[in-house]
């Protein structure tokens, strides 16, 4: 994603709900020789174990001929967010917006500390 930042262009992000969606997005990105972000939303994590999701999407991303970012989108469950970091998601979004501000900040801090320990 660094080339996009340096060269000032956007990278599209698509919510995917299964392998077929993800494959179609990656194939379209490859046809355009464009980077892409595959976003996994909360609904997908409620119906499929995170380990299965990463097992399905990570090989697809790694075998793509263009850069593919795996993003866990708007997830409010800290253990799930941490599990996603450990499993190899490129980015995560912890969403504590429904919590009191102090709890939200504490949750963000916990996720950031864990992510920084992975560097």
What does each of the following model-derived ranges do?
Residues 1-12:
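N-terminal amphipathic alpha-helix/helix-capping segment at the start of soluble metabolic enzymes
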Residues 7-8, 32, 118:
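Structured helix-beta-strand junction loops
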Residues 11-15, 36-40, 68-74, 92-94:
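Hydrophobic faces of well-ordered beta-strands that scaffold small-molecule active sites
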Residues 19-64:
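Glycine-rich, positively charged N-terminal anion/phosphate-binding segment
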Residues 20-23, 46-54, 74-83, 97-119:
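Active-site-adjacent beta->alpha loops and helix N-cap segments on the catalytic face
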Residues 32-34, 86-92:
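Glycine-enriched alpha-helix->loop->beta-strand junction motifs that scaffold or abut catalytic
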Residues 64-71, 118-119:
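Short beta-strand/loop segments at the ligand-binding rim of alpha/beta enzyme cores
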């Amino acid at each position: 994603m660094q080339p996009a930042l340096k060269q000032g262009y956007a990278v599209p992000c698509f919510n995917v709900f299964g392998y077929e969606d993800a494959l179609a997005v990656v194939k379209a990105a490859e046809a355009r020789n464009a980077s892409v972000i595959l976003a996994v939303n909360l609904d997908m994590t409620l119906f499929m174990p995170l380990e299965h999701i990463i097992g399905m999407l990570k090989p697809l991303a790694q075998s793509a001929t263009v850069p593919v970012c795996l993003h866990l989108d708007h997830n409010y469950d800290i253990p799930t967010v941490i599990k996603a970091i450990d499993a190899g998601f490129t980015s995560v979004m912890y969403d504590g917006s429904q919590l009191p501000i102090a709890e939200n900040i504490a949750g963000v801090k916990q996720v950031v500390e864990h992510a920084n320990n992975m560097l």
